């Protein structure tokens, strides 16, 4: 058994698709009209046949209060792996992405948290013992 799909709840599918592809660098895998909304998935360009992220409309009545509660408490909705948190932080910040947490070492990982502009906080994380600022170890 393996994970095939994961979802992130978004308040605007077009805006989310632009952010997740043009800013974060994912690739569109599916964009299928389904009535009022679309079935949109994005994938990592490094693993186009891997896990797909569904840009799911947050229209269910429970979705917005759930997202608001997570966001107001500073809790990321999901996390993405990166090779170097500091480099991604610098790249994304230069593109205007707002971060709620700068790169921070948390035990064996370094993390940062960004706002995806669609109602979610997203954590980026770098595994291993290499501090984001020192570039040593591994």
Show where each model-derived region lies.
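Vicinal oxygen chelate
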Residues: 1-5, 27-81, 89-115, 125-138
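Conserved active-site tyrosine of GNAT-family acetyltransferases
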Residues: 16-21, 92, 119
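Conserved catalytic-loop position in the HRD/HxD motif
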Residues: 84
């Amino acid at each position: 058994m393996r994970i095939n799909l994961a979802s992130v709840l978004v308040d605007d599918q077009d805006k989310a698709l632009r952010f997740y592809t043009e800013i974060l660098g994912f690739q569109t895998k599916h964009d299928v009209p389904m009535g009022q909304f679309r079935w949109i998935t994005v994938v990592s360009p490094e693993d186009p046949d891997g896990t797909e992220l569904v840009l799911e409309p947050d229209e269910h009545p429970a979705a917005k209060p759930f997202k608001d509660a997570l966001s107001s408490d500073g809790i990321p909705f999901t996390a993405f792996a990166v090779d170097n948190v500091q480099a991604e932080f610098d790249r994304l910040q230069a593109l205007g992405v707002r971060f709620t947490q700068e790169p921070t070492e948390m035990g064996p990982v370094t993390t940062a948290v960004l706002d995806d502009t669609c109602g979610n906080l997203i954590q980026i994380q770098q595994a291993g013992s290499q501090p984001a600022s020192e570039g040593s170890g591994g």
